[in-house]
Amino acid sequence: MNLSRLFSVKSKGQAADPVSAPRSPFIVNSFGLSDRGQIRSSNEDCFVVAELTRTLQVHHSNLPQSKATFSCNRGHVFLVADGVGGSKAGEVASGLSVRNIEEFLLNTLKRSSNLQASEEQGILRDLQNALFQADARLFEEVRAHPEWQGMGTTLTMALAVNWRLFVAHAGDSRCYLYSEKKLQQLTHDHTMAAEMVRRRIIAPQDQEHHPWRHVVTNILGGTERGVQAELHSLDLHAGDLLLLCSDGLTEMVPEDQIAAILEDESDPQRACERLVAEANKRGGKDNITAIVAHIKQGEP
Protein backbone atom coordinates (compact mmCIF):
# COMPACT_ATOMS: atom_id res chain seq x y z
CA MET A 1 0.00 0.00 0.00
CA ASN A 2 1.36 3.45 -0.87
CA LEU A 3 0.70 7.12 -0.47
CA SER A 4 -1.46 7.23 -3.60
CA ARG A 5 -4.21 5.81 -1.39
CA LEU A 6 -4.21 8.94 0.74
CA PHE A 7 -7.75 10.33 1.15
CA SER A 8 -6.80 13.91 2.04
CA VAL A 9 -4.31 15.96 4.01
CA LYS A 10 -5.27 19.25 5.58
CA SER A 11 -3.04 21.44 7.70
CA LYS A 12 -3.81 24.38 9.92
CA GLY A 13 -0.91 26.58 10.97
CA GLN A 14 2.76 25.80 10.66
CA ALA A 15 5.01 23.42 12.53
CA ALA A 16 7.43 24.95 15.00
CA ASP A 17 10.76 26.04 13.57
CA PRO A 18 13.24 23.32 14.59
CA VAL A 19 15.84 25.92 15.54
CA SER A 20 13.49 28.12 17.57
CA ALA A 21 13.42 28.12 21.36
CA PRO A 22 11.37 25.28 22.86
CA ARG A 23 7.80 26.07 23.88
CA SER A 24 6.43 25.65 27.37
CA PRO A 25 5.71 22.08 28.50
CA PHE A 26 2.74 20.39 26.86
CA ILE A 27 0.21 18.81 29.25
CA VAL A 28 -2.82 16.73 28.26
CA ASN A 29 -5.57 15.64 30.65
CA SER A 30 -7.89 13.09 29.06
CA PHE A 31 -10.67 10.60 29.72
CA GLY A 32 -12.72 8.13 27.70
CA LEU A 33 -16.11 6.52 28.26
CA SER A 34 -18.18 3.98 26.32
CA ASP A 35 -21.78 2.91 26.91
CA ARG A 36 -24.02 0.29 25.31
CA GLY A 37 -26.87 2.77 24.95
CA GLN A 38 -30.59 2.12 25.44
CA ILE A 39 -31.32 -0.19 22.50
CA ARG A 40 -28.34 -2.38 21.60
CA SER A 41 -27.73 -5.65 23.47
CA SER A 42 -23.93 -5.38 23.18
CA ASN A 43 -21.27 -2.72 22.76
CA GLU A 44 -19.34 -2.86 19.47
CA ASP A 45 -17.43 0.36 20.16
CA CYS A 46 -13.82 0.23 21.34
CA PHE A 47 -11.66 3.11 22.55
CA VAL A 48 -8.17 3.73 23.88
CA VAL A 49 -6.63 6.66 25.75
CA ALA A 50 -2.87 6.18 26.05
CA GLU A 51 0.52 7.84 26.41
CA LEU A 52 3.61 7.01 24.40
CA THR A 53 6.67 7.39 26.61
CA ARG A 54 10.36 6.69 26.40
CA THR A 55 11.71 5.31 29.68
CA LEU A 56 15.03 4.10 31.06
CA GLN A 57 14.95 2.37 34.45
CA VAL A 58 18.24 2.19 36.35
CA HIS A 59 18.33 -0.80 38.73
CA HIS A 60 22.00 -0.70 39.79
CA SER A 61 24.80 1.78 39.18
CA ASN A 62 27.99 3.06 40.82
CA LEU A 63 27.25 6.55 39.56
CA PRO A 64 26.39 8.97 42.38
CA GLN A 65 22.77 10.05 42.68
CA SER A 66 21.55 7.88 39.83
CA LYS A 67 17.86 8.35 39.26
CA ALA A 68 15.64 5.30 39.28
CA THR A 69 13.81 6.32 36.13
CA PHE A 70 14.47 8.68 33.25
CA SER A 71 11.26 9.25 31.32
CA CYS A 72 10.33 11.46 28.39
CA ASN A 73 6.72 11.85 27.33
CA ARG A 74 6.46 11.34 23.57
CA GLY A 75 2.80 11.77 22.84
CA HIS A 76 -0.83 11.12 23.68
CA VAL A 77 -2.83 8.66 21.58
CA PHE A 78 -6.62 8.49 21.28
CA LEU A 79 -8.55 5.84 19.33
CA VAL A 80 -12.26 5.27 18.68
CA ALA A 81 -13.50 2.31 16.64
CA ASP A 82 -17.14 1.49 15.91
CA GLY A 83 -17.73 -2.06 14.71
CA VAL A 84 -19.87 -2.38 11.60
CA GLY A 85 -22.36 -5.14 11.03
CA GLY A 86 -24.61 -5.16 14.08
CA SER A 87 -23.40 -8.61 15.09
CA LYS A 88 -20.64 -10.20 17.14
CA ALA A 89 -18.33 -9.69 14.15
CA GLY A 90 -18.54 -5.91 14.56
CA GLU A 91 -17.27 -6.17 18.11
CA VAL A 92 -14.46 -8.46 16.94
CA ALA A 93 -13.48 -6.05 14.15
CA SER A 94 -13.25 -2.97 16.37
CA GLY A 95 -11.32 -4.82 19.07
CA LEU A 96 -8.87 -6.43 16.66
CA SER A 97 -8.21 -3.16 14.87
CA VAL A 98 -7.55 -1.19 18.04
CA ARG A 99 -5.17 -3.84 19.40
CA ASN A 100 -3.36 -4.05 16.07
CA ILE A 101 -2.90 -0.29 15.90
CA GLU A 102 -1.68 -0.18 19.51
CA GLU A 103 1.03 -2.69 18.64
CA PHE A 104 1.94 -0.91 15.42
CA LEU A 105 2.32 2.48 17.10
CA LEU A 106 4.37 1.05 19.95
CA ASN A 107 6.84 -0.48 17.51
CA THR A 108 6.83 2.27 14.89
CA LEU A 109 6.47 5.73 16.42
CA LYS A 110 10.03 6.30 17.53
CA ARG A 111 9.80 10.08 17.58
CA SER A 112 10.95 12.30 20.40
CA SER A 113 8.68 14.77 22.16
CA ASN A 114 10.71 17.64 20.65
CA LEU A 115 8.96 17.30 17.30
CA GLN A 116 10.83 18.67 14.30
CA ALA A 117 9.06 20.05 11.23
CA SER A 118 10.82 17.50 9.05
CA GLU A 119 9.25 14.64 11.03
CA GLU A 120 5.61 15.54 10.39
CA GLN A 121 5.19 13.75 7.08
CA GLY A 122 6.80 10.67 8.61
CA ILE A 123 4.30 10.67 11.47
CA LEU A 124 1.37 11.04 9.08
CA ARG A 125 2.78 8.19 7.01
CA ASP A 126 3.08 6.04 10.14
CA LEU A 127 -0.53 6.71 11.11
CA GLN A 128 -1.67 5.94 7.58
CA ASN A 129 0.27 2.67 7.59
CA ALA A 130 -1.28 1.77 10.93
CA LEU A 131 -4.73 1.88 9.30
CA PHE A 132 -3.49 -0.09 6.28
CA GLN A 133 -2.03 -2.82 8.49
CA ALA A 134 -5.15 -3.08 10.64
CA ASP A 135 -7.28 -3.33 7.49
CA ALA A 136 -5.13 -6.17 6.14
CA ARG A 137 -5.28 -7.96 9.50
CA LEU A 138 -9.09 -8.06 9.42
CA PHE A 139 -9.08 -9.82 6.05
CA GLU A 140 -6.54 -12.32 7.39
CA GLU A 141 -8.87 -13.08 10.29
CA VAL A 142 -11.82 -13.57 7.94
CA ARG A 143 -9.86 -16.21 6.03
CA ALA A 144 -9.38 -18.09 9.30
CA HIS A 145 -12.96 -17.45 10.48
CA PRO A 146 -15.37 -17.41 7.51
CA GLU A 147 -18.27 -16.74 9.87
CA TRP A 148 -16.86 -13.22 10.29
CA GLN A 149 -17.15 -12.46 6.58
CA GLY A 150 -17.91 -8.78 6.01
CA MET A 151 -16.88 -7.58 9.46
CA GLY A 152 -15.52 -4.07 9.56
CA THR A 153 -14.99 -1.03 11.73
CA THR A 154 -14.62 2.71 11.61
CA LEU A 155 -11.37 4.04 13.06
CA THR A 156 -10.59 7.57 14.21
CA MET A 157 -7.17 8.12 15.75
CA ALA A 158 -5.43 11.22 17.08
CA LEU A 159 -1.84 11.73 18.22
CA ALA A 160 -1.05 14.88 20.23
CA VAL A 161 2.63 15.70 20.61
CA ASN A 162 4.53 18.93 21.28
CA TRP A 163 1.59 21.25 20.53
CA ARG A 164 0.75 19.46 17.28
CA LEU A 165 -2.19 17.18 16.50
CA PHE A 166 -2.14 14.39 13.91
CA VAL A 167 -5.36 12.65 12.89
CA ALA A 168 -5.98 9.50 10.83
CA HIS A 169 -9.55 8.56 10.05
CA ALA A 170 -11.84 6.18 8.18
CA GLY A 171 -15.60 5.89 8.60
CA ASP A 172 -18.21 8.02 10.36
CA SER A 173 -16.81 8.34 13.85
CA ARG A 174 -15.54 11.87 14.36
CA CYS A 175 -12.74 14.03 15.73
CA TYR A 176 -13.63 17.54 16.87
CA LEU A 177 -11.58 20.50 18.08
CA TYR A 178 -13.23 22.88 20.54
CA SER A 179 -11.20 26.08 20.56
CA GLU A 180 -12.10 29.69 21.39
CA LYS A 181 -15.73 28.71 21.98
CA LYS A 182 -16.06 27.15 18.52
CA LEU A 183 -16.61 23.47 17.71
CA GLN A 184 -14.90 22.34 14.51
CA GLN A 185 -15.32 18.89 12.97
CA LEU A 186 -11.84 17.95 11.76
CA THR A 187 -12.80 14.71 10.00
CA HIS A 188 -15.23 14.03 7.16
CA ASP A 189 -17.99 11.44 7.43
CA HIS A 190 -17.32 8.64 4.97
CA THR A 191 -20.97 7.90 4.24
CA MET A 192 -23.11 7.88 1.13
CA ALA A 193 -25.15 10.86 2.35
CA ALA A 194 -22.03 12.90 3.18
CA GLU A 195 -20.61 12.15 -0.25
CA MET A 196 -23.86 13.36 -1.82
CA VAL A 197 -23.46 16.63 0.08
CA ARG A 198 -19.85 17.00 -1.12
CA ARG A 199 -21.05 16.46 -4.70
CA ARG A 200 -23.91 18.94 -4.14
CA ILE A 201 -26.56 16.34 -4.89
CA ILE A 202 -28.32 17.10 -1.61
CA ALA A 203 -28.14 20.12 0.70
CA PRO A 204 -26.10 19.88 3.93
CA GLN A 205 -29.24 20.23 6.05
CA ASP A 206 -30.77 17.19 4.32
CA GLN A 207 -27.95 14.89 5.40
CA GLU A 208 -29.09 14.63 9.02
CA HIS A 209 -32.23 12.65 8.16
CA HIS A 210 -31.22 11.12 4.83
CA PRO A 211 -31.84 7.33 4.66
CA TRP A 212 -28.27 6.80 3.41
CA ARG A 213 -26.59 8.64 6.27
CA HIS A 214 -25.64 5.30 7.85
CA VAL A 215 -24.27 3.74 4.64
CA VAL A 216 -20.53 3.85 5.39
CA THR A 217 -18.34 3.96 2.28
CA ASN A 218 -14.84 3.68 3.77
CA ILE A 219 -13.97 1.40 6.69
CA LEU A 220 -11.36 -1.07 7.86
CA GLY A 221 -12.39 -4.53 6.71
CA GLY A 222 -15.86 -4.86 5.25
CA THR A 223 -16.47 -6.40 1.85
CA GLU A 224 -13.67 -4.68 -0.11
CA ARG A 225 -9.97 -4.30 0.59
CA GLY A 226 -8.32 -0.91 0.46
CA VAL A 227 -9.22 1.49 3.27
CA GLN A 228 -8.50 5.13 2.43
CA ALA A 229 -6.81 7.08 5.23
CA GLU A 230 -7.97 10.66 5.73
CA LEU A 231 -5.11 12.57 7.38
CA HIS A 232 -4.86 15.94 9.11
CA SER A 233 -2.28 17.91 11.05
CA LEU A 234 -2.72 21.18 12.92
CA ASP A 235 -1.50 23.33 15.80
CA LEU A 236 -2.84 22.99 19.32
CA HIS A 237 -3.14 25.79 21.87
CA ALA A 238 -3.56 25.97 25.62
CA GLY A 239 -7.23 25.61 26.52
CA ASP A 240 -8.16 23.54 23.46
CA LEU A 241 -10.41 20.51 23.90
CA LEU A 242 -10.38 17.46 21.65
CA LEU A 243 -13.39 15.20 21.24
CA LEU A 244 -13.28 11.81 19.53
CA CYS A 245 -16.61 10.01 19.38
CA SER A 246 -18.67 7.35 17.67
CA ASP A 247 -21.83 8.22 15.75
CA GLY A 248 -23.88 7.00 18.70
CA LEU A 249 -23.13 10.40 20.23
CA THR A 250 -23.50 12.64 17.19
CA GLU A 251 -26.70 10.94 15.99
CA MET A 252 -28.36 11.74 19.32
CA VAL A 253 -26.82 15.03 20.45
CA PRO A 254 -26.72 18.07 18.12
CA GLU A 255 -23.44 19.92 17.76
CA ASP A 256 -24.65 23.04 19.55
CA GLN A 257 -25.42 20.93 22.62
CA ILE A 258 -22.05 19.17 22.37
CA ALA A 259 -20.37 22.58 22.26
CA ALA A 260 -22.37 23.77 25.27
CA ILE A 261 -21.28 20.75 27.32
CA LEU A 262 -17.63 21.22 26.37
CA GLU A 263 -17.88 24.91 27.27
CA ASP A 264 -19.32 24.04 30.70
CA GLU A 265 -17.00 21.11 31.45
CA SER A 266 -13.26 21.48 30.87
CA ASP A 267 -12.74 18.41 33.09
CA PRO A 268 -12.52 15.50 30.62
CA GLN A 269 -14.24 12.94 32.86
CA ARG A 270 -17.19 15.18 33.63
CA ALA A 271 -17.47 16.15 29.96
CA CYS A 272 -17.56 12.50 28.85
CA GLU A 273 -20.11 11.59 31.49
CA ARG A 274 -22.40 14.43 30.47
CA LEU A 275 -22.07 13.72 26.75
CA VAL A 276 -22.93 10.03 27.18
CA ALA A 277 -25.77 10.82 29.57
CA GLU A 278 -27.22 13.33 27.10
CA ALA A 279 -27.11 10.77 24.27
CA ASN A 280 -28.91 8.23 26.45
CA LYS A 281 -31.44 10.84 27.55
CA ARG A 282 -32.28 11.49 23.90
CA GLY A 283 -32.85 7.80 23.13
CA GLY A 284 -29.44 6.11 23.12
CA LYS A 285 -30.21 4.27 19.87
CA ASP A 286 -26.61 3.11 19.33
CA ASN A 287 -23.46 2.45 21.33
CA ILE A 288 -22.00 5.72 22.61
CA THR A 289 -18.29 6.46 22.97
CA ALA A 290 -16.58 9.75 23.80
CA ILE A 291 -12.97 10.73 24.48
CA VAL A 292 -12.24 14.25 25.69
CA ALA A 293 -8.72 15.67 26.03
CA HIS A 294 -7.89 19.06 27.56
CA ILE A 295 -4.70 20.72 26.31
CA LYS A 296 -2.84 22.71 28.96
CA GLN A 297 0.36 24.68 29.24
CA GLY A 298 2.69 23.53 31.98
CA GLU A 299 5.24 25.45 33.99
CA PRO A 300 8.24 26.57 31.90
Regions found by a protein language model. Give the residues of each.
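PP2C/PPM-type serine/threonine phosphatase catalytic domain
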Residues: 1-300
